[in-house]
């Protein structure tokens, strides 16, 4: 009986540790490919700060890059992670990018398993580059490498 209990405990531990935490190989390969990022012209609505990331809420007329479920949503939520968050946060806090402003974003629009990976890799307005695509993508890749899944 003790062996069965121990075996069940070990199996439970393995499943717990191999859960959905971190970025697996499929996720890392997809999100590091620059061809999987789409340019979106949007109107900035608002943002929220959450732990180590930002959520940007935008409106866009052209939702072809997004999942069909987004077509009925008035706003789309995009996520800013890692160093990209550190780079962009002050522009939102200082209202350099404010409600109603036109902004061009380059972001992933990938849904994998049960998660939305709408990650912002570039942000610019007509006259200002807030985050370059090269830096933004490099920061996303670094963030994923620092947060790999066990399997």
Language-model region placement:
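Short, cysteine-centered beta-strand-loop-beta hairpins and adjacent loop/turn segments enriched
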Residues: 64-72, 112-114
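Positively charged n-region of N-terminal signal peptides that target proteins for export
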Residues: 1-4
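Flexible glycine-rich surface loops and low-complexity tracts that mediate binding to linear polymers
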Residues: 96-121
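C-terminal partner/receptor-binding element of secreted or periplasmic proteins
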Residues: 118-151
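Bacterial signal peptide processing site
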Residues: 21-23
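Beta-strand/loop nucleic-acid-binding surfaces
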Residues: 68-95
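C-terminal motif of bacterial Sec signal peptides marking the signal peptidase cleavage site
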Residues: 16-19
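Structural detector for short beta-strands of small beta-barrel domains
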Residues: 34-62
